[in-house]
């Protein structure tokens, strides 16, 4: 008679993490971040208007688990202009501190941050697999942000024949 050792590891003990509490905390954090956005957006539009910028375009592209903003362009009417070297307050939450942190960011950096935030909120994982591309328009005159989002996907069609 031979003695056979088990080949499977012993089962793991039950988790001691309260996942319901983790989800509640994440939901509360997301709500706090969402509550900061209107004031950040208003400060951005005020800064763009003061600089004479009528709108900003942001193009992005990604696929294969990698994506980024390709270009951020500022416009005064139909004329491309440079962003001025000014900073505005931007309210944010960091991972390691529950308090709101006020940062001084350039207008261009605030545009970039908001674009990434809105992409994550509306189309999380946009850069994965076949990816996506598109454009934001931050319209300072209308005080609105417009997103055109193009999702790539692989499709297949089945054809059957009998001969």
Regions found by a protein language model. Give the residues of each.
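Exposed alpha-helical structural elements
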Residues: 18-21, 43, 110, 114
């Amino acid at each position: 008679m031979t003695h056979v050792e088990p080949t499977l590891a012993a089962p793991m003990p039950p988790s001691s993490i309260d996942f319901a509490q983790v989800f509640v905390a994440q939901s509360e954090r997301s709500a706090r971040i969402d509550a900061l956005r209107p004031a950040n957006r208003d400060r951005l539009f005020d800064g763009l208007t003061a600089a004479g910028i009528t709108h900003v375009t942001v193009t992005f592209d990604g696929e294969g688990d990698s994506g980024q903003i390709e270009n951020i362009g500022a416009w005064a009417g139909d004329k491309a202009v440079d962003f001025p070297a000014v900073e505005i307050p931007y309210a944010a939450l960091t991972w390691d501190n529950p308090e709101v942190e006020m940062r001084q960011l350039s207008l261009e950096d605030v545009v970039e941050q908001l674009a990434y935030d809105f992409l994550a909120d509306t189309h999380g994982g946009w850069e994965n697999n076949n990816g996506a591309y598109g454009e934001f328009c931050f319209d300072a005159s209308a005080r609105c942000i417009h997103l055109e989002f193009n999702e790539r996907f692989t499709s297949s069609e089945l054809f059957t024949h009998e001969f």
